[in-house]
Amino acid sequence: MHNVRVEKINEKADECRQNQNAATIEFKLEGEWRTSKDEKQFGGQLSFPNGELALDADFPSFLGGEGRAPSALAYCFFGAMSCYGSTFATQAAMANVNLKSLKISLSLSVDFRGAIGIGTFPPLKGFDFKVHVDSSASNDDIQKVKKLTDERCPAIWAMKNPVPFTTSAVKAL
């Protein structure tokens, strides 16, 4: 339904009832800072089941880059928007709510004063997702799908819950 293979989701759900790790995907990403001024500042490969994609990032000029590629945060925000939109489409299909089209927008602002050493400020002011749906379903059904999306979207979960992290830095020999 609307480019969501519900039967595959149902198969995986059945598998998860027997194996709690069946729906776990491990990610391992690598990238590199480029020191040549002729190159975009950061790059890496992103692997997915059917291939790889080369990605580059470059800060805007006021953060020391030249804006030759999206910033790292732009990728984060696109990922959050894509995750929410994809989860919405998936939840709609699972609820048998057909979508003729779905468009999503995300608005937010970032305060970079902390990043440039001016003080300690919360950098993010809030995410405003807007989903525009063309569907023959009732508004009540659309709102039920939105509620399921808010409950099940991994990006929303990550915004609501502190995610543990570790960092390390190792000097090359």
What do these predicted ranges mean?
Residues 80-84:
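Alpha-helical metal-binding/catalytic segments enriched in His/Glu/Asp
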